[in-house]
Amino acid sequence: MGNLFYFILAAFCEISGCYLFWLHFRSDKPALLLLPAAACLLVFAYLLTKIDTATAGRAYAVYGGIYIVCSLAWMYGIEKFSPDIWDYIGVGICLIGASVILFAPR
């Protein structure tokens, strides 16, 4: 499977895990949510080890751009809140930076 698949899956595992923590600590949902939250975060960390790159730092830097896109998709799809123009501009800037890191000749 390709890097993009792992990046997107990792992002949704991280966002899911963090969102479950958010629900417990900010919305008074049951503490039982912390178990699947921890599992999601473990899977997230594992998935980033599957990225085909020589350095962890470069994988994490590129992942950052993908994470931001997935976060806005989460906000729209799960939280039912539409991104605004500044969200789109910000994600564009981040994707440009991630692309420079990913596609730079080395």
UniProtKB/Swiss-Prot annotation:
Keywords: Cell inner membrane, Cell membrane, Membrane, Transmembrane, Transmembrane helix. It holds the Pfam family UPF0060. It is a multi-pass membrane protein. SUPFAM superfamilies: Multidrug resistance efflux transporter EmrE. It is found in: Cell inner membrane. Its main location: membrane. The keyword Protein biosynthesis does not apply. GO terms for cellular component: plasma membrane. It comes from the Bacteria. The chain crosses the membrane at residues 5-25, 31-51, 59-79, 85-105. Belongs to the UPF0060 family. PANTHER family: UPF0060 MEMBRANE PROTEIN YNFA. This is UPF0060 membrane protein CHU_3331. The lineage of its organism: Bacteria, Pseudomonadati, Bacteroidota, Cytophagia, Cytophagales.
